[in-house]
Amino acid sequence: MSSSTQVGLKEQLHPLIRDLATGIEATWQRWLNLEPYAAMPADLGYIEGKLEGERLQIENRCYQSREFRKLHLELARVGNNLDILHCVLFPRTTFDLPMFGADLVGGRGQISAAIVDLSPTTIARELSNDYIAGLTALPNPTFQGLRELPTWGDIFSSFCLFIRPGSPEEEAAFLDRALGFLQVHCQQAAAATALTDPEAIATVLEQQRYYCEQQRRNDKTRRVLEKAFGDDWADRYMTTMLFDLPSD
């Protein structure tokens, strides 16, 4: 297993993944004051391994800001057969904000799964009126290949979009909608006021923990990591990098 710096992984990935990764980081830079993520595990910035004889590469980019304890963008590639983007923004528990999440999975030139959502891990357990207004104002194209959410998907909002893009036009429309979600989120976060009530903060903490616990039930992700690196490493990666629980 290698943890050396890798240059150019993004450029090897499917164009939609490249474009979404670039757009995500540009949106962060525009709306937020980013700092390096203080709790980044030193050995998990770049990882290499083998999965069924194919080279597995994982690159993690993590930041923090006033509003978010962690902004995580993961890019991964398995040989020439599988490209992955995973992104989650974890609000600080002193901010009553939803969780932005986006995932792309592709292989052999096709995107098989594309999902984006703002999950309402908030005190009211639903998106605020400001979020609803912002999301409703976005262009909302029709997609043909809608996919069914997983059984643990009660964390997702009614705005969740989960598709298998059927054309370059649908890929472009998904990109625009995902970045629209993110811009609404960053705008709302930048304008948000920190919570001071201990009970409210405790409720946000409880909701974030539930979100992370549900996401950890994604058996597909865990199985890939276990095959490549073993059970213990996979568990550590799931709990310290992908869906670490807030402590504050």
UniProtKB/Swiss-Prot annotation:
It catalyses: (2R,3Z)-phycocyanobilin + 4 oxidized [2Fe-2S]-[ferredoxin] = biliverdin IXalpha + 4 reduced [2Fe-2S]-[ferredoxin] + 4 H(+). Its EC number is 1.3.7.5. One of its GO terms (biological process) is phytochromobilin biosynthetic process. The keyword Oxidoreductase applies. Keywords: Oxidoreductase. GO terms for molecular function: cobalt ion binding; phycocyanobilin:ferredoxin oxidoreductase activity. It is an enzyme of class 1 (oxidoreductase). The keyword Iron does not apply. InterPro entries: Ferredoxin-dep_bilin_Rdtase, Ferredoxin_bilin_OxRdtase. Catalyzes the four-electron reduction of biliverdin IX-alpha (2-electron reduction at both the A and D rings); the reaction proceeds via an isolatable 2-electron intermediate, 181,182-dihydrobiliverdin. Belongs to the HY2 family. This is Phycocyanobilin:ferredoxin oxidoreductase. It comes from Synechococcus elongatus (strain ATCC 33912 / PCC 7942 / FACHB-805) (Anacystis nidulans R2).
